Amino acid sequence: RFREFLQFDADFVGTKSLQADAELCVMISEILEKCGLAKEEYIIKISSRKITEELFKKINLDSNDQKLTALRALDKIDRLGWEGVRQLLGDGRKDKSGDFTKGANLSTSNVKTIENELNKKSPETKDLLEILKIFKDYSFSNFEFDPSIIRGLEYYTGPIFEVNLKFDVKN
């Protein structure tokens, strides 16, 4: 990786319960607040890998190599924006250093379909809807659905969470 970021991990082992996934978000929120952050200073973004899997079915994308390349491209949307991601979903992209990254070689119409579907911001999977219901039961509201939260690694298979600070970090 060419960028630096801080992260920590917490996992439940031995359960596939969506209750556990929802509780992780609540736990993250509680930890951040104990560290002195106010709810207004961060947001937990959620998505589901199943959304992209359904999308790949919709455009008849069967090649595992193309899927992985497309996921890695979509994972860069926060850094490259849609223009850069479109290039990576297509033939490829040359970055500022001059390095060329081969793209997923998707057709222009498939790239447009992906962009349109992900910009709808409508939770379409059962798992995500269940997590949203659990959040409501917990009166937990410090989250937003963001379909651009996608991980380019194969072991991500379901709900995905990411915490973003709403202020610039100095030092």
Give the label of every model feature segment.
Residues 1-143, 147-155, 162-170:
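Extended, charged alpha-beta segments that form solvent-exposed binding/catalytic grooves
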